[in-house]
Amino acid sequence: MKNSLFVTKRNGKKEKINLDKIHKVLNWAAKGLENISVSQVELRSRIQFYNNISTVNIHETIIKAAADLISENTPDYQYMAARLAIFHLRKKAYGQFEPPNLYYHVKKMVQLGKYDEKLLQNYSFEEYVEMNSFVDHRRDMNFSYAAVKQLEAKYLLQNRVTGQIYESAQFLYILISACLFSKYEKKVRMNYIQRFYNAISTFKISLPTPIMSGVRTPTRQFSSCVLIECADNLNSINATTSAIVKYVSQRAGIGINAGQIRALGSPIRNGEAFHTGCIPFYKHFQSAVKSCSQGGVRGGAATVFYPIWHLEIESLLVLKNNRGIEENRVRHLDYAVQINKLMYQRMLLGQKITLFSPSDVPKLYEFFFSDQKKFKEIYIKYEKNRNIRKKSINAIDLFCLIMRERASTGRIYIQHVDHCNSHSAFNSKLATIRQSNLCLEITLPTKPLNNIDDKNGEIALCTLSALNLGLINDLHDLKELSTLSVRALDEILEYQNYPVVCAKKSAISRRSLGIGVINFAYYLAKNKVRYSDGSAKNLTHKTFEAIQYYLLKASCELAKEKGSCSLFNQTNYYLGKFPIDTYKKDIDSICNEPLHLNWNLLRKKIKKYGLRNSTLSALMPSETSSQISNATNGIEPPRGFISIKSSKDGMLRQVVPEYKKLKSEYELLWEIPNNIGYLELVAIMQKFVDQSISANTNYDPKRFLNEKIPMKQLIYDLLVAYKLGIKTLYYQNTRDGAEDNQNLNKSIENIKEDNCTSGSCTI
């Protein structure tokens, strides 16, 4: 190519194109990487150059040229493209490649109103000098290309109208650390800041979107999950809607318990009017959820919960599907059906399920969650009462309808309310679990509010993070990571603001945390065990025992230091009951691995000092944060060795960790013959996890006769999940062949934005 083209520089000046300069930058970006051809990137770039092209466009062109070469055979292009993108980001943020001094950067951002002014008030110049020495900007070069694009799109502070970037990744990490430990004593806080910075900047701890995009800014709401319960009256419905708007606007995903709302045709004011039923109010909730785009970072999303025995269930189950008309569909919410043992027994015995309006059957709704024995007694009593409006339906027909809609939409979720209360962190008589959250991994107590300032209501909040299993060398590594995670998240509860008063009361008195994992598939591959054949069971048992043990130990140590949470007496831990005491004993038939840690000593310490946090663990989806950490998603098997995610910058490709070394050890999703191996691992995890797990079921029609998934298979898997004590089921994924039709490779995963990347219970 001739050197005759002119370029327009960032300052507006024109000069002749300097191909040698481009060549040097590409060589720098390729240094130390394998299977990289600088000349190929140059050739792909040059054919797109034109006269007076801006240097910004040149940079974006060479980034895309490198990114387009990412493949199974040449995975290192994801790092070359990332380095070029980091170079570009720093030029946009700072006007140069070298980042400025931390103190002067913070001072400038506070003056611009971008950073929280407390950053300057809480730390001295000398402390910023010390923090600046902790920062290792070379760690930017460890990001994959997909990670850099996610950082740019969702996490780095920017003007979302003009696109101006204000910071780079290492400043994001050090300032999150500084904000979270600002209230610690001066003599110890620098130590915690450095340790936490090192853990998050090397991807050992993964943080959720609200924390990554919000901590250090003047907007202080970082709880990922918000659970709101609605009572059966207009005041509560309106208060619920108001709370939804407040939290959706501040980056949170929503779980809505609407199960108490009475059924269509129910009398109002002793028959003066009849009720319009659930659907109009679900539409009201949908409008509230979609009213805000969560600060430009993500769109609002919510899951609505209702009991299987609700009189309107046949109409509610079809709200998500593509049939019907606008009046009888509410498609932009997801739904979860709440089920207990009695309903399964009715199905297995070929009996009927009786449907009621909750308003017609006093105490039934309450006992459905809090007392299974009393629920059964009064359910049968109400069935026999001829004066109560009801409808009987064959149990198998109702379960088939549930599973048909779950298969059709993928977004009808399941909550086993008896497991959620019998195997809970909470004493179900004092703090009943009546719903979950957007992504089905949070199980916290809620109470309806009758107005937005109702101090007697309870909105549950959960603050999330995850441990990167792929980066631990020994289970003892989890001790330090658990300590840092618990301490950092606990500080967030005091650091953040609360848009609704009853949410603050709940968050501060319960101090619930949900710490999960990412990179489980890589962890299994590294240890040469698999999802499907049972070989991962013992490793999973040992790993999740260690996670829960060290999380509880960290919370107990914090309670010794700062005091236990004020509602600790409402937990099972207060009674000396741990998840290892209340788990479904059917798990023992699939895994006989013993406990390895000193639980008796930990019990004694918790009895003496209590716990700082009511809950510690929850296993959430982690699509976005896994990309940042170049990890596999949560506990899920990858669909392909390369994942592809659509973005405004085109298709983002990311290769699974250590692909070349571990290709034969990874078990891809559609290679797994059925759900049983995966569900058994989830059940083993649930033995230790004190909240719940976003567990999915997956079906490849090609494995079945006539490529039709038999209903009996869907029901069987549901029964297995219940039998093994699994609390919740999230997505049902059906292989549609889309990823097979990609022109790239058969082992490519196509990731679509879903409610969990747009909702906030993910990390």
UniProtKB/Swiss-Prot annotation:
Key words, A-Z: Allosteric enzyme, ATP-binding, Deoxyribonucleotide synthesis, Disulfide bond, Nucleotide-binding, Oxidoreductase
SUPFAM superfamilies membership: PFL-like glycyl radical enzymes, R1 subunit of ribonucleotide reductase, N-terminal domain
A cellular component term, taken from the record's GO annotations: ribonucleoside-diphosphate reductase complex
The reaction(s) this protein catalyses: a 2'-deoxyribonucleoside 5'-diphosphate + [thioredoxin]-disulfide + H2O = a ribonucleoside 5'-diphosphate + [thioredoxin]-dithiol
The keyword Nucleotidyltransferase is annotated on this UniProt entry: no
Binding site for GDP: T209, N437, E441, E623, T624, S625
EC number from the UniProt entry: 1.17.4.1
Activity regulation annotation text: Under complex allosteric control mediated by deoxynucleoside triphosphates and ATP binding to separate specificity and activation sites on the alpha subunit. The type of nucleotide bound at the specificity site determines substrate preference. It seems probable that ATP makes the enzyme reduce CDP and UDP, dGTP favors ADP reduction and dTTP favors GDP reduction. Stimulated by ATP and inhibited by dATP binding to the activity site.
Disulphides: C225-C462
Active-site residues, record numbering mapped to chain: N437, C439, E441
Entry keyword ATP-binding: yes
Site residues by UniProt (Important for hydrogen atom transfer): C225, C462
Positions annotated to bind dTTP: D232, N233, L234, R262, R269
BP terms from Gene Ontology: deoxyribonucleotide biosynthetic process
Positions of ATP binding: K9, E15, K16, I17, N18, L19, D20, K21, T55, K91
Subunit structure and binding partners: Tetramer of two alpha and two beta subunits.
Protein family (similarity comment): Belongs to the ribonucleoside diphosphate reductase large chain family.
Role played: Provides the precursors necessary for DNA synthesis. Catalyzes the biosynthesis of deoxyribonucleotides from the corresponding ribonucleotides.
Protein's UniProt name: Ribonucleoside-diphosphate reductase subunit alpha
Native source species: Buchnera aphidicola subsp. Schizaphis graminum (strain Sg)
